[in-house]
Every structure is written in structure tokens, then in C-alpha cells.
Regions:
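Active-site neighborhoods and metal-handling regions in enzymes and metal-associated proteins
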Residues: 1-278
């Protein structure tokens, strides 16, 4: 097709044509700086909805199911005049109980660890966020230390991603660097981050897939560019002493931007502590 266009243009005009095989990808991946303020507002809405969903406003331990929380989130977005780009999910982990034993929509009990995956669409933009929560047992004022440590280890994996991502590196090169540092620090994690913006899973380099931790052919070979957004999607699994060494998975996802100067930073902020249901 390019050759036909050049032939139709003739030598003089064809000589002005610059070939760039990545122009379509870069056009979709690159964000206009003025979008960031709008996107930050959307992230604020997401955090507000999640904070309310993971509270006693919505959850009554022993009665509320995970599916009840999902549909509260959908109703809240509908009330705000917004919509999701995928159906939200809420899941639970429980001491001494395998995840498959809990079923698809368990009743939330005290002592449960909760996880949500939630994304909204507004003004032509998409978000994708995952947070973790803990349901306090009677007499508790905070989550057990082992669960707090588990969250800190997942946050450290986020830090590693932000530190290792550089403009010009391919997604696969970033993945390799991130996993090497993860292993050096003794973390048991998985990296599966993706571009976001006009589309929930946007154009640009993938940094892993959950089942492709050795690199993603094609999509992982594209280089990171300045002025793009990422959903920093990942998980770290940590044995928790208070749960008799049972592994607990902390899966986090927040939006980050690659700035004009090549720094990767949070669009709004990340989750720093477990949401607490009292």
C-alpha cells in the first residue's frame, strides 16, 4: 500500500514522506497533557466509590455477599451518570479456607480479606483499579501485622515497576528488569501491566501477562513512550503468620503516567493502607 501511494504521489512528493510503522500505536498511546487533570478527577471518583464499597456503609459482616457489593458499585455509578467498561468483581480470601471453597458470591465474614477490580468510562477515557480490604474481627482496631506486611510487599513491587520503566525500553525489557529486581528482593509476584486511556486495554507495550512472565511476543516488543498512561496491574503472594502461614494474594492496580521527562508517577495516588470494614 505504501509503494502504491508513493507511485501515485510521484518522486517529488514521495520524497517528503516519512515512514513510521508505529505511528498508529503511538498516536493512540500518547496522552495530551491537558487530559491528565480530567483523568485525575475520574480516579478520584473511583477511589471514593471503592472506599464507600469497602466500608460499613455497604458491608454488614455475616449478611452482605461479595455480589451485593458489586451491584452496589454499579448502582452508585449509575446514580452518578457514569458506566463501567467491564463488570466489577469483588472476591474474598479467608483463613483456613481455599478460594474455590468460598464459591462465586460468599457471605462476607469478619476476618476476610477482600479484593475488588473496578473500572469506569467517562469523557472517552477508561480507568482500571484494584484495591484490597480487611474485615475487622471483634476487638480488632487494625488488620493483623502479617496482612499489613503483605500489602507493603505488593506496594514495593509497584515501586520497582515505577523505578525500572524507562522511555525507549520495550515492555519485555521492563518486565525482565522488574522481575529480576523482584526476585532479588525475595518477592513472590506476577506482573501484568497494560496501557490505558482511550481503551481499557490500550495501544502500546504490555509489561507481562499473567501467563506470559517471560515476555509477550509482539505486544511486549513495542517501546515505552513519554506521555502515556499505564494500569500498573500486579500481585504479590505472601505467607501470613496469623493465618498459620497461609499465602495471601495482594493484587493491586493503579493508573500511572509516563511524563514528558520520562518519569513514571501516579496519576492520582495509590492505595497505601488496607480499607477497613468495621
Amino acid at each position: 500500500a505504501v509503494e502504491q501511494m508513493q507511485e501515485a504521489l510521484g518522486p517529488e512528493l514521495a520524497g517528503r514522506v516519512v515512514r513510521n510503522p508505529r505511528i498508529a500505536i503511538d498516536y493512540l498511546a500518547m496522552r495530551v497533557p491537558s487530559m491528565t487533570q480530567v483523568y485525575r478527577r475520574l480516579q478520584g471518583i473511583v477511589h471514593e466509590v471503592i472506599s464507600a464499597a469497602f466500608s460499613n456503609l455497604v458491608i454488614m459482616p455475616g449478611e452482605t455477599t461479595t455480589e451485593d457489593v458489586v451491584w452496589w458499585m454499579r448502582q452508585r455509578l449509575n446514580d452518578l451518570g457514569l458506566q463501567t467498561w467491564f463488570h466489577p468483581s469483588v472476591s474474598a480470601q479467608r483463613r483456613g479456607v481455599a478460594s474455590d471453597e468460598l464459591g462465586d458470591s460468599p457471605v462476607i465474614e469478619r476476618g476476610d480479606v477482600l479484593h475488588c477490580d473496578f473500572g469506569i468510562t467517562a469523557m472517552g477515557l477508561n480507568t482500571d483499579t484494584q484495591h484490597m480490604a480487611y474485615v475487622l474481627r471483634d476487638g480488632e482496631t487494625d488488620a493483623p501485622e502479617g496482612l499489613q506486611v503483605a500489602l507493603e510487599r505488593a506496594k514495593r513491587f509497584q515501586d520497582i515497576l515505577l523505578e525500572e520503566t524507562k522511555v525507549g525500553m520495550s515492555g519485555n525489557a521492563v518486565l525482565e528488569a522488574v522481575l529480576a529486581q523482584m526476585q532479588a528482593e525475595g518477592l513472590d509476584g506476577t506482573m501484568y501491566s497494560h496501557p490505558i486511556g482511550d481503551h481499557g486495554h490500550g495501544a502500546g507495550p504490555l509489561i507481562g501477562l499473567w501467563d506470559y512472565q517471560e515476555g509477550v511476543p509482539g505486544r511486549g516488543d513495542v517501546p515505552v513512550i513519554a506521555n502515556m498512561w499505564y494500569s500498573t496491574e500486579l500481585q504479590v503472594t505472601t505467607p501470613v503468620p496469623e493465618w498459620d502461614g497461609q499465602p495471601v494474594r495482594m493484587a493491586l492496580e493503579e493508573e500511572a503516567e509516563v511524563t514528558t521527562d520520562g518519569e513514571m508517577r501516579w496519576v492520582l495516588r495509590r492505595q497505601t493502607e488496607l480499607h477497613l470494614v468495621r
